[in-house]
Regions:
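Alpha-helical nucleic-acid-binding subdomain
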Residues: 99, 220-466, 472-481, 489, ...
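Short hydrophobic beta-strand that contains or immediately precedes a catalytic carboxylate
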Residues: 182, 467-468
Length: 697
């Protein structure tokens, strides 16, 4: 094994290390030539303007995918095959494929079948590989490597200094990929077939978010043509989280996946109907919980279909000198047959004129005429038929329907009869009736209802694959909104029931998968933590018997590093300033996690450069968030983030800020598990009883 810590700017004395460094330089040069060839492609050679635009877009994406970041290693491993189809060959495994001028691979994509043994092979099952090599890098320069023999009887290493160093590498900036450190149990999930929906119950630090993103990258590689047509969507809990994970897929060469929040999805539906509509308020917890209840789907369906009007009289269609009649009873039968088809409201409405016209056509044939399809089409388009159809089957604006439902007590009572109690109906009604969708006081839960109503009217097109993170915090109605985006596709569901911090969130994965429309999905548990130090996760796990008694406690693989300090102080903010002087002297990122109410006082007291997570509301806006070494993090936004060093203020206030103690303890569990190297807890009030005695220093 070559030393992983060899200085990158000195000439290596190890010939093998020198050879690997030359291969890295040659591979970078080859990648540059690949990009030059892509840049030289001329879309003007296309036969027409449309083709030229398509080719130019394709070439631009190709050039972007071939961009090289000199600080990121082109490869991180090597496989030397001894048996099978690749016997005698060696392959360098990296984030993307790189080939020389003759097309021979210099680096193979980590997602290629030939790379699979890098993640799965063992001494017991070597998969044809004799040697697995891992590389150490510093700022993109190759500094060393270590070899692991997989030949039977040679004694497999179960410890990798390079692997541990990569896992523990200090974090500054947004989330990075884990492609060099994917573990076998993670890789099984990453490479699950596109047709299979998976649910990952992952304890803190098990890499569930990274696994979900790498699964998206793998599926885009393995099913590129299909998913380029159908689309891949990543749904995160908030804009700050999307900023944090936003660089992972591009770093893996994937730029085709769309990333958004659930609010982005449903508000997109609302504004597509009424461009001036916007979220203007937040619901109280009990109201939001009721609006997120699955029973609201029945209420909305009742409201949508209540618009059908029984015919008061028959249809009369003048044509030439004749007047053709469809009696009211027959029109009612036609409406009932369309309703029984089980299609969307809007689709059935579009069929009605043709069905009425066909009834007229039958009358013509019975009278001895010989009409054809052209006559039926003309009758269906005629003014009497269109007007009659519009009367029986009025158009429905989903936003106006929900606005009426939340403003009109009588309309709500009719739609919710037998579904919601009178008390629940009263809770749903807005304090002041809305006037128009563009100016209505919509909440996020209201927008979810509009999204449901819109799907009842016209089917939401399905994507090929959807990844939803922090799924445990979504209500049944929110999960239905995600699920209909993958009605004919598959999903990757990520979350941790112990970290559920919304009163409307689901309490079991079986329920969540049912709401997503994927009850057949298998739940995979990740309990081996690679990020959170052992003593930190054990301290946080004291809360599990109360917040998630059915879950297995996480086990950290990191026993040699990490630091936990719990200190009672007379005054929080002065103590924080003193602690930060010490923590900022260390290497790595620092997160100060505070109850939301303390963000202002803490920010005012800090005299060192810092950023505030969540300070930029627009996910697309430029921001220093996560680019600073020091971030102040409201507890409500801590989920999914990680920092080398975390300073957590006043757990008691953090718990008390939530609607109930259970939610507060779950929020505390989230905040306690954000640290990669050290956790310092400062408190002036007594710690919550569930944390037990203070750990010995």
């Amino acid at each position: 094994m070559s030393s992983p810590s060899a200085a990158p700017d000195t000439e290596p004395t190890d010939p093998a290390l020198a050879a690997e460094q030359r291969h890295l330089a040659d591979a970078r040069a080859a990648l540059a030539r690949m990009r030059d060839r892509a840049a030289a492609m001329d879309a003007a050679a296309a036969g027409d303007w449309v083709s030229a635009q398509y080719l130019e877009s394709t070439f631009a994406l190709r050039r972007k995918a071939l961009a090289d970041d000199p600080t990121v290693p082109l490869f991180f491993g090597r496989l030397d095959y001894a048996d099978g189809d690749y016997a005698g060959e060696s392959f360098h495994v990296g984030r993307r494929h790189v080939s020389d001028d003759e097309g021979e691979p210099m680096v193979v994509d980590w997602r290629a079948p030939v790379s699979l043994p890098f993640y799965r092979a063992s001494a017991g099952e070597p998969m044809g590989v004799a040697l697995r090599r891992r590389y150490g890098f510093l700022h993109g320069a190759l500094t060393g490597f270590e070899d692991e023999s997989l030949v039977a009887g040679t004694g497999q290493r179960d410890y990798s200094a390079i692997l541990e160093a990569e896992i523990e590498r200090p974090r500054v900036g947004p989330m990075r990929d884990i492609v060099a450190t994917i573990q076998p149990e993670q890789d099984v999930i990453v490479r699950a077939d596109l047709s299979r929906s998976v649910c990952v119950q992952g304890a803190p630090g098990t890499g569930k978010t990274a696994v979900g993103l790498h699964r998206a990258a793998y599926l885009l590689y393995a099913h590129r043509d299909q998913l380029r047509r159908q689309g891949v969507l990543v749904v995160g809990p908030n804009a700050s989280f999307l900023r944090y994970i936003g660089d992972v897929l591009p770093a893996l060469g994937e730029i085709d996946a769309r990333q958004t929040t659930l609010a982005g999805l449903v508000v997109g539906t609302l504004t597509s109907l009424h461009p001036k509509a916007a979220l203007r308020r937040e619901d109280p917890a009990d109201v939001a919980t009721l609006k997120g209840d699955e029973r609201m789907a029945t209420v909305l369906a009742n409201a949508v279909w209540s618009g059908l009007v029984p015919p008061a009289e028959g249809l009369v269609v003048p044509r030439g000198a004749s007047r053709w009649r469809v009696p009211a009873w027959q029109a009612e039968e036609i409406v009932a047959s369309l309703r029984a088809r089980g299609v969307r409201y809007g689709a059935a409405r579009a069929m009605l004129p043709q069905r009425l016209a066909h009834a007229v056509l039958v009358k013509m044939e019975e009278a001895g005429d010989s009409p054809d399809d052209r006559v039926q089409d003309a009758v269906a388009r005629s003014r009497p038929v269109r007007a009659y159809a519009d009367t029986l089957w009025p158009a429905v604006d989903p936003a106006r329907l929900v606005l009426r439902l939340l403003s009109d007590a009588d309309f709500l009572a009719t739609a919710a009869d037998g579904v919601l109690t009178p008390e629940e109906q009263a809770l749903l009604l807005w304090p002041r009736p809305g006037r128009a969708p563009g100016s209505a006081p919509w909440s996020l839960a209201d927008a979810v209802l509009v999204d449901e109503a819109a799907d009842l009217v016209a089917r939401e097109p399905s994507l090929g694959h959807v990844v939803v993170d922090e799924a445990q915090d979504n209500s049944p109605m929110m999960l239905r909104a995600v699920g209909r985006r993958a009605s004919t596709g598959s999903v990757t569901v990520l979350g941790d029931l112990a970290q559920a911090t919304t009163p409307w969130g689901v309490r079991s994965w079986a329920a969540a998968l049912a709401h997503l429309g994927k009850p057949e999905a298998v739940v995979d548990q990740l309990t081996r933590g690679f990020r959170v130090p052992g003593e930190v996760i054990e301290f946080a796990a004291r809360l599990l018997p109360l917040i998630a008694p059915d879950l297995e406690p996480p086990v950290s693989v990191r026993r040699t590093r990490g630091e936990l300090v719990v200190t009672r102080v007379p005054a929080l903010v002065p103590a924080l300033v003193g602690v930060l002087d010490e923590v900022l002297a260390r290497v790595g990122s620092v997160g100060v996690i505070v109850p939301d109410a303390l963000v202002g006082p803490v920010v005012d007291a800090l005299e060192v450069p810092h950023a505030v997570v969540g300070s930029s509301p627009d996910v697309e806006s430029a921001t220093v968030e996560f680019d600073s070494r020091l971030d102040v993090v409201p507890a409500s936004l801590a989920k999914g983030l990680e920092f080398d060093h975390v300073v957590l203020l006043e757990p008691a206030d953090l718990v008390a800020a939530e609607p109930d103690e259970l939610t507060g303890l779950r929020r505390l569990y989230v905040c306690l598990t954000r640290a990669v190297t050290s956790l310092t807890v400062l408190h002036a009030q007594p710690l919550p009883d569930a944390l037990g005695p203070v750990p010995a220093a």
